[in-house]
Amino acid sequence: TREVVLEVKKLNHSFGETIVAKDINFQCHQGEVIALIGPNGTGKSTIGRILAGLLKEKSGEVVLFGKHCRPKGRLGKVWYIPQDLDSQLFGEDLLDELTTGAEVSPERKQAAEEILEALELMPFIKQHPSTLSGGQKQRLALGVALMHEAPIIILDEPTSGLDGTNMRNVSKMIRKLAKMGRTIIVITHDAECALACCERAIRLENGCITDDFQIRGAE
């Protein structure tokens, strides 16, 4: 059996009178790819931001690797990739994007190049991130999460606006990261996206979990 890396217990959140997460309970295992699915406005992104420590829950508990974890402690361990990637990508080129924020040692440069190779982005290494396609930007954002060694990665609507080819490429990379032991949560309203890359789905409606089911066995 795979290790439980993330557990959510009785999580509640609201904005004013509007309840966006009500008594949310679920577990995620190492190497699992889970879809948080449901229509827009059902609290999916809010839950994602809470798990990543970007938003403090009103009540409830988030447990990482068996230990209760406050929002600050979740930063960096749970990596949130938003839908609007242009607000996240700042580097001069792809290598700079992956190595920014630290002095670039030869080892760090090699690690970044290996990640770009794995994500099939090496041909674009000298390009500015803004010149990439939507699918390539998603893969680059995954690369940034890998450079930070985040064990849990949350992608918010990763296939939004992508054509079939780019969607398949992003799905392939998500499954590849899961095989490397990363736990991936995919926030989506798109059943096709969930079917393409996830093994399990948690359905949300009006801030509540209405279903939690296997899509397929672990690969």
Model-derived features: where do they sit?
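Catalytic Walker B motif of ABC-type/P-loop ATPase nucleotide-binding domains
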Residues: 153-156
